[in-house]
Amino acid sequence: MAATGEALTPQGYIQHHLTNLSVGEGFWTWHIDSLFFSVGLGVLFLWLFHSVGKKATTGVPGKLQCFVEMIVEFVDNSVKETFHGRNPVIAPLALTIFVWVFMMNFMDMVPVDWIPELAMAAGIPYMKVVPTTDLNITFSMAIGVFLLIIYYSIKVKGVSGFVKELTMQPFNHWAMIPVNFLLETVTLIAKPISLALRLFGNLYAGELIFILIALMYGANWALSTLGVTLQLGWLIFHILVITLQAFIFMMLTIVYLSMAHEDH
């Protein structure tokens, strides 16, 4: 598969699958495929949960309602065990993060050539279908969490309390203010960076492994047979990875917001 219709080398095949459909240049580059799939999956999540909630019954629930209730209960229990403040926004936020990130991660389970081949048939040269393999997407979510951390830190502690937290911890002495400020600022900035890079790194690596396995199908029958076995094994293992990464992103968000609500 190639944008030009010519056969690709293994290196070109990998590069093609890791290239976004984009417009613009430099800082103003927009990754159309990442935006399309992330927004589309977000809308699908909202529609699905809204529909289930609207049709929910106190009688014998259907399979979909049971599944949704199980997810909601799991997230709600996670919030109750981790978040020590009182904020009605946290549980819905955690639910949105967990399901949305999982759905974006789940796109990695689709065979790597299926959607790009359909896009090629429609005249679209590139199509990267896993939004969480795009740093722009993971950083945008992490920055959103970071802004909430700042907002609730100031709301709960006040401006003076937030400034005091940055300047008087961990060493509670005026002479250590520069050191405290440096340490606390680095710690604060590290939160969104670690959130974004952890999710991106794990999903990008998983996608790359699927691409490398797909390359084996174009070799000989022995490698093709091995590729089938490897793909099945990695598929099963990767289900755990995509679920775990969604859970970690959700839990770290809850922990960070819980820390923001702690008034020292």
UniProtKB/Swiss-Prot annotation:
The record's Gene Ontology cellular component field reads: plasma membrane; proton-transporting ATP synthase complex
Q: How does it sit in the membrane?
A: Multi-pass membrane protein
* GO biological process: one example: proton motive force-driven plasma membrane ATP synthesis
Does the keyword field hold Ion transport? Answer: yes
Query: What subcellular locations does the record give?
Result: Cell inner membrane
Give the source's domain of life in one word: Bacteria
Q: Name one GO molecular function term.
A: proton-transporting ATP synthase activity, rotational mechanism
Q: Which UniProt keywords apply?
A: ATP synthesis, Cell inner membrane, Cell membrane, CF(0), Hydrogen ion transport, Ion transport, Membrane, Transmembrane, Transmembrane helix, Transport
Major place of localization?
Answer: membrane
- Indicate the transmembrane segments per the record: 32-52, 89-109, 134-154, 177-197, 208-228, 235-255
Keyword Transmembrane helix in record: yes
Instruction: Report the sequence similarity comment from the record.
Output: Belongs to the ATPase A chain family.
Please describe the quaternary structure of this protein. Answer: F-type ATPases have 2 components, CF(1) - the catalytic core - and CF(0) - the membrane proton channel. CF(1) has five subunits: alpha(3), beta(3), gamma(1), delta(1), epsilon(1). CF(0) has three main subunits: a(1), b(2) and c(9-12). The alpha and beta chains form an alternating ring which encloses part of the gamma chain. CF(1) is attached to CF(0) by a central stalk formed by the gamma and epsilon chains, while a peripheral stalk is formed by the delta and b chains.
Q: What is the stated purpose of this protein?
A: Key component of the proton channel; it plays a direct role in the translocation of protons across the membrane.
Designated name of the protein: ATP synthase subunit a
Highest lineage ranks of the organism?
Answer: Bacteria, Pseudomonadati, Pseudomonadota, Gammaproteobacteria, Alteromonadales
